[in-house]
Amino acid sequence: GSEMCIRDRSSPRLNVYSDQIVWGRSPVRIDMAGGWTDTPPYSLFAGGSVVNIAIELNGQPPLQVYIKPCAEHRIVLRSIDMGAMEVVNTFEELQSYCMIGSPFSIPKAALALAGFVPAFSETAYPSLEKQLEAFGTGIEITLLSAIPAGSGLGTSSILASTVLGSLSDFCGLMWDKNEICRRTLALEQLLTTGGGWQDQYGGVL
């Protein structure tokens, strides 16, 4: 649960030049057998085995994330497929990731796990603006999902993994694939949706 990730505080450090973009892309996954046997609490007691395959859509990874520096010390979130945008200026706004139905719950929770809220940060900052000032830039995250959430293709989990992996690159956190998948599980606990481990592993590995 969230205790796991609160112990793992992060110390994000800008890892790109001002004109660079981190571009993360992932396929989605299809269950062949064993769906939901990966989901706690069942998997904790009985173990779980899932066979799945990763697929692309029209030859393109259907889930894409772009992260780039932003001149102002704030966080800008955009969704191309939903035509939505939100500007985040405070820790409180960033911590609104458990609001059901928000198009930006996943990137907000991912930013939290990357160390951009006090509970997950190694360093205490008086405000998000001050933290981004110390970080050296604001952050703009753009999401593109060619497949709707709730499609049964693991979209939300894999989008979460893709955002976390891209943030790891952008912030020099050096998370490997196992760490990204572990934090995806933590992210889903933060969003209170819960979930197993096969979705993110099916798309990331």
What are these regions (language model features)?
Residues 1-153, 165-177, 182:
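ATP-binding N-lobe of GHMP and related small-molecule kinases
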